[in-house]
Amino acid sequence: MTLPLTTPGFTDAEHSKRLINKTFTYVVTLLIAIFAAAIISLLIIKNNVNEISDSHDDFLLRKALDTRQESIRSHLKDYAEWGDAYKHLHQNVDMHWAWDKQNLGKSLYDNFGYEGVFVLSPEGATRYSVISGKRIPEDLERWLGQSTKDRLLSELSKKKGVPVSMLTLIDGIPAIVSAEWITTGDDSSVQPLPGRPSVMVFVDKLTAKKLLAIGHDAAIKNVRISPNEVNNQTSLTISTPNGDVHILWDSENPGQALIVYFLPLLILSVLL
């Protein structure tokens, strides 16, 4: 007895068509799954690349701000540890030497952008001030506030007069403030007097223009201040004695380049 080669109720054509449909459905489902997995993987890679890039920018920006503080301390050291400065600024301020001869004058603003230059008496009173390159009588305490000034001088005392610096807010603008005792330095021709030293203070406001320049030097785009905290990858918050500083920048977004380059290739490979 010969058994039928086909399933009862189905012709050979119907059986082949059914098999083709199953195979096609399987292949299409597999391709869709592969495509979806590839898209998800690509998005994950994009986010990871962006996160690494943004973290690197965060590191570079913090480093740039630290370097700027080191720079202002170095400049201050050159002026405060100077025998002539000790002679003309410690007990009494010699205006002719300081301002008329421009030994402590507008060049600090023109060359370094220091908006504030102050000389304080041993008691902490402001004896001399240059504001944005102009000889304007101004009290340091009015600029910084009592608590910030006290903290600065306290830190200076703990460090035995070597240059110190800190970040603060002045009228909502972040600023680096650096202070150092005025000494004779290596000048043996000037004899130090007994008693407490006078203090020299430099103030560097981080204006919008300066922040853009800092970012440009670090290859970071559009560095700026935000009045409010923003919780994203392209922001950092720095605490100061009188408030937090929120700094933002524009991400390089290198992950987007991966999407633009690989996504069309991925779609094309699926279609082909």
Description of each model-found segment:
Residues 15-20, 212-215, 246-269:
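Membrane-interface helix-start motif
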Residues 2-11, 234-251:
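Juxtamembrane amphipathic/hinge helix adjacent to a transmembrane helix
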Residues 120-126:
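Short acidic/glycine-rich beta-turn/loop cap or linker motifs at sensory/regulatory domain boundaries
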Residues 129-131, 140-144, 171-215, 246-252:
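Conserved beta-strands of PAS-like sensory domains
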Residues 20-23, 27-92, 234:
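Juxtamembrane extracytoplasmic/periplasmic/luminal helical "stalk" adjacent to the first N-terminal
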Residues 37-48, 258-272:
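Juxtamembrane or sensor-core-proximal signal-transducing alpha helices
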Residues 93-111, 129-169, 202-239:
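Extracytoplasmic/periplasmic sensor domains and loops in membrane signaling proteins
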